[in-house]
Design a protein with these regions (language model features):
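Carboxylate-rich, polar loop motifs that coordinate divalent cations or form catalytic acidic clusters
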Residues: 1-407
Length: 407
């Protein structure tokens, strides 16, 4: 086997939190390996009310709260908020949404957009003064590196240098309670907009306009649209449940309603607002108003996964769920949140006993790293650096001594 240590970028995490999680993932021989832990930095947050989360291109986890911005680097949390020393650091400390381009993290608040320079973490206001002092509902940097910013009832489209291309004013009627819920780019580069009370829209690039779709449910209130790994579309609504969406079908076959029943409340769940699909089991994880749900897709329909055996409270007041680049999930909530680690089923459950046989004494893993080539780097105390090939279920030694690798 060629020496992977010279050709692989390695992400190493020395946090004891992750080491404990790895050991827990090797306990059960039958259960699916999903481990839920409280977010490890809650006491450092400016507020436990986590509104939105984002993992940037460098791997940092950003958290938007009602009282400031946090950046987690795997060890500790750095906070950004206006105070008496820096009264205008952010245009507003109530963080609502994120987007990211090659140079900046874009932070949406109740008072416009802030640009966080990723090279030095200097913060400045977004140059378009028309949207400052405005609640930013949602933002998207698309595959063409163009920016879309949604405010109450309009969408603003920008070039990559933040110059305005076009403002789509009054996309929906400016009546009380109407607004833009979200904007989304699918796998084919199509841009979709979900609106409160105004229905679903698709951007038509050839005419530079938005096309509306037929009324959805009784309230015509799509909250999020999502395309799964098999390119199937799902629409989460606020008030009418979840629909399978067939964009090219006739109007009478365009929306297929999914029956989602809340056993605890003995009634259908009708309001949904955040969605992601994990890479390990292919479950679609969705936040409902009352509960966190996980679904399998079978014959084009959602089948509920029983989460009752997992040790976490899935009835929290959740806010946003995201997937990090290691395939694990982060679930923000208005009263803290969870880090859901998706155990790779390719890793044998007797990993630790095998390692003990390999080294000849008790295992004591002090450092873990995730290898993008489907493996794990780790340091075994009194042995040294090792690499575990998940596909081949083999260990490889990379230390010339048995003294170990010290942090």
């Amino acid at each position: 086997m060629e020496n992977r240590i010279h050709r692989t970028e390695i992400q190493i995490y020395v946090s004891p939190f992750l080491i404990v999680i790895f050991l827990l993932m090797s306990i059960s021989s039958n259960a699916q390996q999903i481990i839920a832990k409280q977010m490890p930095f809650l006491e450092q947050l400016p507020s436990n009310e986590v509104i939105d989360l984002h993992q940037d291109q460098n791997g940092f986890i950003w958290l938007g709260t009602k009282n400031g911005l946090g950046r987690y680097d795997g060890y500790q949390l750095q906070t950004f908020k206006s105070d008496f020393n820096q009264p205008h650091l952010l245009t507003d400390d109530f963080i609502w949404c994120f987007a990211e381009d090659d140079n900046c993290l874009l932070v949406g608040t109740r008072q416009g957009v802030n640009l966080v320079d990723k090279s030095n973490y200097q913060i400045r206001p977004f140059p378009d003064t028309e949207i400052q002092n405005t609640w930013i509902n949602f933002m998207l940097v698309d595959s063409r590196k163009e920016l879309w910013i949604c405010t109450r009832n309009q969408v603003s489209h920008y070039n990559s240098d933040y110059s305005l291309k076009k403002r789509y004013g009054n996309l929906i009627p400016a009546v009380p309670n109407n607004g833009i819920n979200s904007i989304y780019e699918d796998h084919f580069g199509n841009i979709w907009v979900c609106t409160w009370g105004g229905g679903l829209y698709k951007y038509l690039k050839n005419t530079d306009t938005f096309m509306s779709f037929p009324t959805l449910g009784a309230n015509n209130n799509p909250f999020k649209i999502f395309q799964d790994k098999d390119d199937q579309y799902w629409i989460l609504t606020w008030g009418d449940g979840i629909y399978r969406f067939h964009p090219d079908a006739t109007e009478d076959r365009m929306y297929t309603h999914q029956e989602i029943f809340n056993e605890k409340l003995h009634q259908p769940e009708t309001a949904f607002f955040s969605v992601v699909q994990d890479d390990v089991y292919g479950y679609i994880w969705i936040f409902g108003y009352h509960e966190l749900y996980a679904f399998k897709v079978a014959d084009g329909h959602l089948e509920k996964v029983d989460l009752s055996s997992y040790m976490f409270d899935y009835n929290k007041m959740f806010s946003q769920i995201i997937k990090d680049r290691e395939g694990n999930l982060w679930a923000g909530a208005y009263d803290s949140g969870y880090h859901l680690l998706m155990g790779n089923p390719a890793i044998a459950n007797n990993f630790l006993p095998k390692l003990k046989r390999h080294v000849g004494f008790d295992t004591n893993i002090t450092t873990l790293g995730i290898d993008p080539n489907n493996g794990l780097w780790f340091n075994q105390e009194r042995w040294g650096l090792c690499w575990y090939d998940i596909e081949q279920d083999k260990f490889y030694d990379y230390s010339n001594t048995n003294s170990g690798v010290h942090n």
